[in-house]
């Protein structure tokens, strides 16, 4: 559960309505893979990830980034039940993929950076604070099934 004020919830929802999930998702996942290259080991089937340009232009990275932000959108619609919303994804990432749960926090922070880049002055400190709460809540929910 993420505790947001009414104003924070409104700010998150208003900005998210303007997000191009495909563009932002691809950029966020791509940046994660470039900035934290050890995360690439989970995406070996994606082909060429040898350079930042290769990562950022990789169609599989873009497609998976869109999928990730689709799940994030579901989370925004269920802020009062993030653990339930992400239970299956948590189990998948824990039991089958063996993803370090710290990677969820890293991706959330990268997403905040990408949103700031895309929305400039509209991404005020207050909006950032609200999004930081949301990405922390999502990361916590995704890590929930870990032992």
Swiss-Prot record:
Origin: domain of life: Eukaryota
Matches recorded under SUPFAM superfamilies: Globin-like
Modified residues (S-nitrosocysteine): 94
Tissue: Red blood cells.
Keywords for the protein's UniProt record, in alphabetical order: Acetylation, Heme, Iron, Metal-binding, Oxygen transport, Phosphoprotein, S-nitrosylation, Transport
Modification Phosphoserine, positions: 45
Modified residues (N6-acetyllysine): 60, 83, 145
Residue ranges of every copy of the Globin domain listed in the record: 3-147
Gene Ontology cellular component terms for the protein in this record: blood microparticle; haptoglobin-hemoglobin complex; hemoglobin complex
Alphabetical GO biological process terms: hydrogen peroxide catabolic process
Binding positions for heme b per the UniProt entry: 64, 93
Residues found modified as N-acetylvaline: 2
GO molecular function list: haptoglobin binding; heme binding; hemoglobin alpha binding; metal ion binding; organic acid binding; oxygen binding; oxygen carrier activity; peroxidase activity
Protein family (similarity comment): Belongs to the globin family.
Subunit comment: Heterotetramer of two alpha chains and two beta chains.
Biological role stated in the UniProt entry: Involved in oxygen transport from the lung to the various peripheral tissues.
Name of the protein in question: Hemoglobin subunit beta
Source organism: Saimiri sciureus (Common squirrel monkey)
């Amino acid at each position: 559960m993420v505790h947001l004020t009414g104003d924070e919830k409104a700010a998150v929802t208003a900005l998210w309505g303007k997000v191009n999930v495909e563009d932002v998702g691809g950029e966020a996942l791509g940046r994660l893979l470039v900035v934290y290259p050890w995360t690439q080991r989970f995406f070996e089937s994606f082909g060429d990830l040898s350079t930042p340009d290769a990562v950022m232009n990789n169609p599989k990275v873009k497609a998976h980034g869109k999928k990730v932000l689709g799940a994030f959108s579901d989370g925004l619609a269920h802020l009062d039940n993030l653990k339930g919303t992400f239970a299956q994804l948590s189990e998948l990432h824990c039991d089958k993929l063996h993803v370090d749960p710290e990677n969820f926090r890293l991706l959330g922070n990268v997403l905040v950076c990408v949103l700031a880049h895309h929305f400039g002055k509209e991404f005020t400190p207050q909006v950032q604070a609200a999004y930081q709460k949301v990405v922390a809540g999502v990361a916590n929910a995704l890590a929930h099934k870990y032992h």
